[in-house]
């Protein structure tokens, strides 16, 4: 009831005031206060305060008269003490007088003082007046403070109030019902209570609370409620800060409460869950838990086991929620998890009446964070009504109470989610509510079950909204809850064992059909959600069983599918409501990667970060695995059994059963993998995959997941890193089919691939049509409409999917072997897990081979798809999935692969839901459809970046071109373009698989570049990771891009900032698109930011290099974009694109003159300009792009700076204090700087390489998306956290290396420099990357750099210049030019100018200027430190030295560019090393060295060529990595670059192998302190061990 939080927040000052108030308020009748407070809490916060004042005045008069002052004094003392302790505060509040505390603590706290004095003034004795006056004064102070805090706490407070009110009501209902249900004695009261009690319970419960508050209920309920209130607020306060770890705290109360046998076991569940959830329940997050608990309670009431199950749902949900809170962006995610658990309980319980309904309610509650907290479906009918509707209308809830959760659900479904659903998702309920529709259609019981799902969906959606929820949920769901997950399973196994068995039996019954009819029926069912309807009991049971296991994967799949996916997914990262598993969303919701993980976790949302998730997940897995075995079909894919796998298995079964993206979307996306990988991509996938990704992720996930399934642990994990995790999971879902395909693709089943492609193309075309339909409407953003569309399209989708599934199944039959055989590729695919192992290469290469092979045939598409298949599963997934996802949206590219996923459904759902519930993600409709898909593709992993890029490329292009119907068209266009791109790039792809593709198809480029990266062997590794990160980046950027595209880009960005999660996705989309644009099609506008991005992903990198270089020359554009962009390209592309502009021009132009121009534009964005130089061709489009990009850049730069300023990054750092913070901090700085760059630098970002770009871009773009990135960052970072060492290295590498991305700002060069590629390879080598952890280093270094850069800023700009992107970013053409005059000249001039200028130059300069200066300074410092630290890595050192020299030279020579000849080399070195350093600094110093060498070569070559140089330099770094980088670098010299690229690729391999050979000893000469002067660097270069000439070696 109490806001509790306010006093808690104000506890110190209010303690006294509250004590006084409490005397008065305690005098007030608690009943009145409780009732009124409940009502008031329902009212607006301010209104509540006013009402509280009036009411409290009245009550104060009454209470004062009624109560004794002595008691008041005693209570004051106690309450003061207790208030200081929120938990006690709740209890005393209950005993002392909830009203008093409520009034005092609640909004009333501040207002009460006024009221208190007023009432007392009238009725108070004179002796009391002084107290009243003091209170008045004090309260006025409090009021003022509250006025300040209200905005902050308003949401939390309202949520808390509503949730607590609902919670109180629900708790009492549940409490009573729990007694009734559990006791079964009071079962009769259940229905009456729900209906009557809803109102009566509010009154009675309030009264009872008032009475019981003094008595057991007062202790139990109040303890639960108040504590939950207190906890909730504290949770809000603490949790977000404390992060996931606090999860246990919030959980503790639940556990404590559960431990406390307040009433009966049911009460424990109810009371506990309620208390636990109650705490959460009060808050939205609490409600989620509450509802989750409601579900638990209901379920619990039904069975203790269900309690556990309920616990499970609640816990998981909470975690997700918390993760979200940690992410701050996705409260929904947590909710989602809770819902899932609740759902599971309800479903498992099989008691449709109360139990089933209850579960849903919880979900709903969570969905609403605020509103639904309670009921949303009110775990019980009561909960539903109370919680779900409670928010909207208690009356309806009352009516629906019997309906139970379902009724709420029904309302939610119909109402759009009575309280919460409507609220959070608005469409969520709608989403699930829409989903709920089936529940409505279903019998009440089924509804209850479904309702739970729907509620789950709702929860997911909602969570996004309630920030507090996240905290509270997290708390609750954080640790203990997750264990609850096993409990859920355990309970399931024990108590609900029979029910569960029944469910399993039902599943078995359905499994044959699902598995056999898996394509058609399940699809129909799932898609339509009719599936739920159609097989409501079975489906629900299956879902429930799955949910229990899968975390509602199936059920969520359903509800989640439309629902969760829909907006929630889109909206809330975790919203993957589609995830419904809650996890995906949760994880997604966990907006942070962890949140995704959480969502994933479903699995303990954040728990991802938390081990419990893994351990628990394993438990679940074991349990689920058993269940699955029991279930029969479920066992279908034992592989998955990793933490995720159980879910995946279930999902796989579900996939078989439902194959709809929904499950994938819900579970896969959210669940296991994210859970597993939250650290990695888990967050990402969820971030990406989460909502938006859902679709793509599903597609890619489907595509990827099969592989993941095959290599569930490794592959999944890797997926995790990428958006892939969720995506993978989803892909798993579809992938069972597609996996086969993809596996086959991986296996080089050209025939199958072709068939698949053909079928997929057909399907995708259908999908396109459908998506277009959906997207257009969705673009409309009408959630309901989305539902309709979903339904309408779903049938189409179903048909298509059925067809696809049938085809796929057929193919699967054909290819089923291939999944296993693919396991080899998958093993390669493991590259995700073990990117280094060429896994990407293994996968991708095979994929590439396949792609290359297919290139001829399906050519680009297949390559992408294949890459998708092969790569797709991995980061490349992007290549594949990327192709897929983008293809999914752009399905034609992705067609074959994407088709497999048919995230399209997901996309559709996502789109619809995202469109409908979309945050600001308007794209969600179209974009999110794609974004979902794309995001997921991205999520898929880096590949998804590619995907993003490609997809969004097309989408963005289309969206940009066709904002309204964009998505539909976009997919096509993009597909077409990507297609064309592929064709054009196809060759590139062939080379850089990704590259060629990428080239033409930015998306593919990136995808394939991702592949390339993967293929890049050395870079590959990094790339995988990079990609993952890229994915995040992309997502964010995509979202931005998407958002931007769809709406006013600025607005979207703002929105993005607002809906960072969505924004992140959008940004990612935007980037992806930008990348795609860079690739070309989209190049125009949107791409600006993306430019850097997308392509940036230098995925192309390694391969890119070779390819980029080789293809790069020709396909280079693609490579550039793609390869170079990709990674190498990134740099190269970035630089190459941007820098590579020159290169781009050459390569880009070569690649696709048109695309090139676009790509250049894109890349150019920076590159474009760069390109401009290159083929003037780019310029024209580039110029247009320039303006657009500049505008974009400026907007982004603005955002970035703001974000910089805002320190968006910092919060994410909070996410994982350590690594995450460092990374985030670095990312922030980088992003801030780089971010600016990323976006502005996008060119840079691209430079940064897609990796960097992706990364850097991610952050860089993120900078633009900083807001998005903030969350994303967290997510990505957390992933990097786990991956930190490996991935972090990569991450950092990406960041640091590609991260130029971060650096990207200036780092672009950095990242761009080989950042991506380097990052890729570096990643492996990067371990020094750990120094990247020092990313803090880079940060610290950067700062120092900043100082240096400050002085040398102009030069620095030049310095950034090295990062063509940098230059881009740093924008000052001079910057680029300055630095690498050589580069700068062409690149700098064109590239830089264009890059900087084009990309950033206008915007860049403004954008970067601050950022560049800061970034660069940081960079310089970083580099210095890194040099010092990474003296190992000569490259970086050299880079620094070179940079330093270069800077000095630049300063000295001024143009420095003129230094070209010798300085050119120096500059090349500098550039190279600067870029590389920047790029490599953190990323591979080795590669950087190598890259440096190569880079130098190329750069020198490029330098020779000039323009290429700049890009080349970075490119060269990329070259090494990027190979493409070479391309990029080569970009300047595409020819030499190409040769160089080839040699560089070799060199990279050799160098990377020998990278240690580069003596970094010279760095040893450098003063260790970061203050060492440039001269020191230069002097250090004099070291005999270090010869620039050594770097010159080809």
Swiss-Prot record:
Stretches with biased composition (Gly residues): 94-111, 353-381, 402-436, 575-604, 981-1001, 1164-1177, 1362-1377, 1390-1400, 1504-1533
Location in or out of the cell: Nucleus; Chromosome
GO molecular function: transcription coactivator activity
GO cellular component, one term: chromosome, centromeric region
Region called 7 X 2 AA tandem repeats of G-V, residue ranges: 1237-1252
Annotated InterPro entries: MAML_N_sf, Mastermind-like_N
GO terms (BP aspect): apposition of dorsal and ventral imaginal disc-derived wing surfaces; asymmetric cell division; CENP-A containing chromatin assembly; chromosome segregation; follicle cell of egg chamber development; germ-line stem cell population maintenance; heart morphogenesis; imaginal disc-derived wing margin morphogenesis
Keywords per UniProt: Chromosome, Developmental protein, Differentiation, Neurogenesis, Nucleus, Repeat
Biased composition (Polar residues): 218-232, 817-827
Region 5 X 2 AA tandem repeats of G-V, annotated ranges: 987-996
Region described as Disordered: 79-127, 175-308, 346-443, 462-496, 569-731, 752-920, 950-1060, 1162-1183, 1362-1438, 1486-1537
Biased composition (Basic and acidic residues): 175-192, 462-477
Compositionally biased region (Low complexity): 79-93, 112-121, 196-217, 259-306, 647-671, 695-718, 754-776, 788-816, 842-909, 950-980, 1002-1012, 1026-1060, 1378-1389, 1401-1438, 1486-1503
Disulfide pattern: none
Superkingdom of this protein's organism: Eukaryota
Predominant cellular place of this UniProt entry's protein: nucleus
Domain notes: The protein has many AA homomeric domains: 21 poly-Gln runs (from 5 to 16 AA in length), 4 poly-Gly (6 to 10 AA), 3 poly-Asn (3 X 5 AA), 1 poly-Ala (10 AA) and 1 poly-Thr (5 AA) runs.
Protein name as catalogued: Neurogenic protein mastermind
Organism of provenance: Drosophila melanogaster (Fruit fly)
Lineage: Eukaryota, Metazoa, Ecdysozoa, Arthropoda, Hexapoda
């Amino acid at each position: 009831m109490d806001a509790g939080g306010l006093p808690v927040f104000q506890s110190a000052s209010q303690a006294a005031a509250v004590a006084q108030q409490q005397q008065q308020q305690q005098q007030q009748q608690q009943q009145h206060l409780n009732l009124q407070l409940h009502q008031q809490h329902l009212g607006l916060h301010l209104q509540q305060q006013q009402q509280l004042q009036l009411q409290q005045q009245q009550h104060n008069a009454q209470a004062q008269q009624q109560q004794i002052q002595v008691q008041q004094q005693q209570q004051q003392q106690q309450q003061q003490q207790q208030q200081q302790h929120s938990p006690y505060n709740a209890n005393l509040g209950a005993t002392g007088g909830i009203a008093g505390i409520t009034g005092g603590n609640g909004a009333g706290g501040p207002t009460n003082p006024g009221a208190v004095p007023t009432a007392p003034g009238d009725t108070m004795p004179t002796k009391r007046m002084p107290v009243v006056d003091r209170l008045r004064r004090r309260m006025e102070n409090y009021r003022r403070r509250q006025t300040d805090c209200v905005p902050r706490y308003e949401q939390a407070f309202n949520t808390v109030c509503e949730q607590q009110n609902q919670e109180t009501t629900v708790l009492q209902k549940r409490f009573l019902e729990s007694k009734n249900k559990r006791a079964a004695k009071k079962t009769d009261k259940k229905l009456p209570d729900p209906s009557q009690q809803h109102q009566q319970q509010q009154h009675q419960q309030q009264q009872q609370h008032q009475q019981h508050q003094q008595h057991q209920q007062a202790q139990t309920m109040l303890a639960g409620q108040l504590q939950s209130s207190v906890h909730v607020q504290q949770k809000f306060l603490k949790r977000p800060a404390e992060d996931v770890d606090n999860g246990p705290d919030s959980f503790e109360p639940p556990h404590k409460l559960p431990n406390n046998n307040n009433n009966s076991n049911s009460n424990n569940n109810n009371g506990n869950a309620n208390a636990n959830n109650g705490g959460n329940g009060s808050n939205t997050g609490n409600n989620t838990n509450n509802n989750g608990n409601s579900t638990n309670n209901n379920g619990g009431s039904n069975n203790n086991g269900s309690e556990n199950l309920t616990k499970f749902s609640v816990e998981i949900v909470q975690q997700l929620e918390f993760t979200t809170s940690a992410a701050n962006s996705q409260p929904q995610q947590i909710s989602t998890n809770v819902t899932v658990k609740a759902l599971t309980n309800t479903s498992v319980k099989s008691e449709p009446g109360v139990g089933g309904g209850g579960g849903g309610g919880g979900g709903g509650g969570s969905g609403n964070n605020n509103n639904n907290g309670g009921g949303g479906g009110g775990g019980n009918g009561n909960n539903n009504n109370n919680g779900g509707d409670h928010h909207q209308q208690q009356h309806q809830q009352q009516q629906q109470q019997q309906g139970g959760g379902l009724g709420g659900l029904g309302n939610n479904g119909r109402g759009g989610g009575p309280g919460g659903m409507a609220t959070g998702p608005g469409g969520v309920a709608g989403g699930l509510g829409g989903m709920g529709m089936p529940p409505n259609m279903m019998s009440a019981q089924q509804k209850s079950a479904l309702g739970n799902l729907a509620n789950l969906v709702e929860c997911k959606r909602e969570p996004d909204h309630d920030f507090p929820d996240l905290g509270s949920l997290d708390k609750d769901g954080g640790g203990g809850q997750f264990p609850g997950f096993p409990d859920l399973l355990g309970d399931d196994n024990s108590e609900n064992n029979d029910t569960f068995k029944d469910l399993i039996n039902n599943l078995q019954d359905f499994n044959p059909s699902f598995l056999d009819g898996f394509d058609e029926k399940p699809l129909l069912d799932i898609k339509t959600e009719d599936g739920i309807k159609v097989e409501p009991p079975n489906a629900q049971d299956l879902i429930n069983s799955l949910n229990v296991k899968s975390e509602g994967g199936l059920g969520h799949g359903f509800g989640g599918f439309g629902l969760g996916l829909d907006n929630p997914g889109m909206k809330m990262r975790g919203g993957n409501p589609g995830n419904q598993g809650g996890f995906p969303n949760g994880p997604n919701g966990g907006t942070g990667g962890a949140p995704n993980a959480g969502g994933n976790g479903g699995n303990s949302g954040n728990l991802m970060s938390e081990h419990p998730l893994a351990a628990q997940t394993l438990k679940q897995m074991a349990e689920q695995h058993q269940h699955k075995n029991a279930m029969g079909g479920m066992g279908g894919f034992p592989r998955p059994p990793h933490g995720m796998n159980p879910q995946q298995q279930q999902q796989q079964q579900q996939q078989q059963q439902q194959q709809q993206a929904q499950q994938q979307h819900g579970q896969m996306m959210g669940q296991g993998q994210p859970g597993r990988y939250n650290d990695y991509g888990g967050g990402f996938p969820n971030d990406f995959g989460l909502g938006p990704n859902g679709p793509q992720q599903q597609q890619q996930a489907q595509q990827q997941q099969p592989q993941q399934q095959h290599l569930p642990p490794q592959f999944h994990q890797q997926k995790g890193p990428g958006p892939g995790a969720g995506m993978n999971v989803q892909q798993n879902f579809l992938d069972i089919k597609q996996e086969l395909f993809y596996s086959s693709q991986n296996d080089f089943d050209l025939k199958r691939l072709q068939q698949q492609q053909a079928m997929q193309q057909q399907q995708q075309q259908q999908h396109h049509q459908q998506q277009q339909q959906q997207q257009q409407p969705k673009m409309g953003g009408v959630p309901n409409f989305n539902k309709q569309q979903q339904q309408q399209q779903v049938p189409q989708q179903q048909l298509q999917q059925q067809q696809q599934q049938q085809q796929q199944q057929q193919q699967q039959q054909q290819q089923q072997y291939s999944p296993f055989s693919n396991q080899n590729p998958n093993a390669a695919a493991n590259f995700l897990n073990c990117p280094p192992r060429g896994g990407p290469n293994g996968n991708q290469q095979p994929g590439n081979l396949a792609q290359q092979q297919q290139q001829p045939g399906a050519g680009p598409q297949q390559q992408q798809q294949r890459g998708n298949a092969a790569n797709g599963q991995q980061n490349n997934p992007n290549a594949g999935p990327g192709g897929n996802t983008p293809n999914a949206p752009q399905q034609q590219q992705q067609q074959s692969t994407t088709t497999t996923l048919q995230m399209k459904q997901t996309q559709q759902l996502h789109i619809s839901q995202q469109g409908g519930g979309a945050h600001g993600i308007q794209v969600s409709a179209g974009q999110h459809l794609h974004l979902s898909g794309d995001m997921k593709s991205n999520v898929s992993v880096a590949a998804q970046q590619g995907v993003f890029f490609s997809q969004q490329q097309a989408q963005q292009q289309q969206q940009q071109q066709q904002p309204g119907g964009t998505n539909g068209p976009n997919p096509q266009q993009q597909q077409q373009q990507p297609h064309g791109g592929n064709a054009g790039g196809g060759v590139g792809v062939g080379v850089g698989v990704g590259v060629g593709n990428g080239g033409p198809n930015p998306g593919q480029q990136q995808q394939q570049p991702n592949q390339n990266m993967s293929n890049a062997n050395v870079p590959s590794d990094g790339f995988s990771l990079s990609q993952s990160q890229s994915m995040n980046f992309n997502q964010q950027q995509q979202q931005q891009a998407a958002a931007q595209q769809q709406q006013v880009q600025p607005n979207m960005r703002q929105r993005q900032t607002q809906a960072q999660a969505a924004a992140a996705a959008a940004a990612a989309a935007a980037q992806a698109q930008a990348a795609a644009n860079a690739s070309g099609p989209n190049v125009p506008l949107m791409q600006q930011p993306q430019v850097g991005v997308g392509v940036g992903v230098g995925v192309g990198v390694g391969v890119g290099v070779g390819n980029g270089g080789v293809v790069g020359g020709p396909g280079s554009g693609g490579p550039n974009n793609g390869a170079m962009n990709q990674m190498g390209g990134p740099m190269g592309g970035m630089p190459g694109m941007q820098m590579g502009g020159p290169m781009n021009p050459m390569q880009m132009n070569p690649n696709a003159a048109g695309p090139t121009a676009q790509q250049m534009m894109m890349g150019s964005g920076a590159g474009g300009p760069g390109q401009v130089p290159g083929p003037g061709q780019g310029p024209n489009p580039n110029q247009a792009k320039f303006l657009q990009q500049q505008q974009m850049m400026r907007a982004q730069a603005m955002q970035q700076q703001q974000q910089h300023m805002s320190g968006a990054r910092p919060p994410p750092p909070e996410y994982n204090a350590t690594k995450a913070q460092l990374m985030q901090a670095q990312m922030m700085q980088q992003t801030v700087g780089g971010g600016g760059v990323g976006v502005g630098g996008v060119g840079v970002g691209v430079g940064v390489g897609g990796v960097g770009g992706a990364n850097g871009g991610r952050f860089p773009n993120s900078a633009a998306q900083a807001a998005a990135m903030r969350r994303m960052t967290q997510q990505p970072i957390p992933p990097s956290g786990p991956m930190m060492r490996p991935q972090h290295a990569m991450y950092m590498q990406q960041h640091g290396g590609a991260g130029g991305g971060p650096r990207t700002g200036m780092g672009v060069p950095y990242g761009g420099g080989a950042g991506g590629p380097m990052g890729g390879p570096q990643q492996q080598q990067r371990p020094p990357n750990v120094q990247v952890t020092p990313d803090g280093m880079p940060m610290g270094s950067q700062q120092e750099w900043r100082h240096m850069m400050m002085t040398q800023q102009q030069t620095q700009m030049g310095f950034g210049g090295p990062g063509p992107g940098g230059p881009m970013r740093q924008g000052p053409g001079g910057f680029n030019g300055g630095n690498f005059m050589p580069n700068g000249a062409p690149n700098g001039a064109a590239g830089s100018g264009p890059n900087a200028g084009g990309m950033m130059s206008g915007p860049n300069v403004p954008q970067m200027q601050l950022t560049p200066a800061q970034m660069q300074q940081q960079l310089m410092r970083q580099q210095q430190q890194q040099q010092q630290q990474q003296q190992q890595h000569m490259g970086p050192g050299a880079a620094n030295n070179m940079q330093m020299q270069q800077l000095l030279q630049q300063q000295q020579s001024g143009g420095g560019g003129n230094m070209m000849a010798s300085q050119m080399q120096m500059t090349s070195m500098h550039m190279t090393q600067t870029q590389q350093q920047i790029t490599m600094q953190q990323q591979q110093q080795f590669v950087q060295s190598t890259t440096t060498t190569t880079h130098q070569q190329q750069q020198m070559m490029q330098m020779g060529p000039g323009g290429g140089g700049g890009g080349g330099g970075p490119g060269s770094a990329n070259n090494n990595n990027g190979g493409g980088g070479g391309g990029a670098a080569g970009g300047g010299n595409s020819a030499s670059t190409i040769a160089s690229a080839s040699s560089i690729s070799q060199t990279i391999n050799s160098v990377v192998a020998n990278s240690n050979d580069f003596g970094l000893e010279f760095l040893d000469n450098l003063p260790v302190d970061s203050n060492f002067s440039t001269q020191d660097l230069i002097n250090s270069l004099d070291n005999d061990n270090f010869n620039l000439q050594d770097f010159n070696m080809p």
